[in-house]
């Protein structure tokens, strides 16, 4: 049982790390050269000064929705980890971790929806930056976090507390 708790906790911490990096780092869309776009800033590399020049992203409604969904997924994942620890130490033997599992399933839905909205609107990014580009590693991390959070939520729902 202690090995299972260790694995579930490690999986949850891995999901948290993936979500933090995916939400806060600067590579949701990479352009040719060293330029990249993220959820918060549009950054370009200035060769003359050897510095990054960043500006706020446009006021697209869909981009604001992706921002909100990714932050919501972080909050829900943190909440589910806190709930798991609370339930682990206060719940009676034989109890199920329904609240933790439900929060983690909501996390997976929020990540899925945010990444899907971003993928659907990739053509708008290409209109603004016609030089091309591709999805960055933060976008890929969001897609990796989705199935992990889904599996984690299902595991939590089926997990019983034993002594």
Swiss-Prot record:
It comes from the Eukaryota. Probably involved in cell proliferation and cell-cell interactions. GO terms for cellular component: plasma membrane. Gene3D superfamilies: 1.20.140.150. Glycans are attached at residues 47, 56. This is Epithelial membrane protein 3. One of its GO terms (biological process) is bleb assembly. The chain crosses the membrane at residues 4-24, 66-86, 100-120, 139-159. It is a multi-pass membrane protein. It comes from Homo sapiens (Human). Belongs to the PMP-22/EMP/MP20 family. Pfam families: PMP22_Claudin (PF00822). Keywords: Glycoprotein, Membrane, Transmembrane, Transmembrane helix. It is found in: Membrane.
């Amino acid at each position: 049982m202690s090995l299972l708790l260790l694995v579930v906790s490690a999986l949850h911490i891995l999901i948290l790390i993936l979500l933090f990096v995916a939400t806060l780092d600067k590579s949701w869309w990479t352009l040719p050269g060293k330029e990249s776009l993220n959820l918060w800033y549009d950054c370009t590399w200035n060769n003359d000064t050897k510095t990054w020049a960043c500006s706020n992203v446009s006021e697209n409604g869909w981009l604001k929705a992706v921002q909100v969904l990714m932050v919501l997924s972080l909050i829900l994942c943190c909440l589910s980890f806190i709930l798991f620890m609370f339930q682990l130490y206060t719940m009676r033997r034989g109890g199920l971790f329904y609240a933790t599992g439900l929060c983690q399933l909501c996390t997976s839905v929020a990540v899925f929806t945010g990444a899907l909205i971003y993928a659907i609107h990739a053509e708008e990014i290409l209109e603004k930056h016609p030089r091309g580009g591709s999805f960055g590693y933060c976008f890929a991390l969001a897609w990796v976090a989705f199935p992990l959070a889904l599996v984690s939520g299902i595991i939590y729902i089926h997990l019983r507390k034993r002594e």
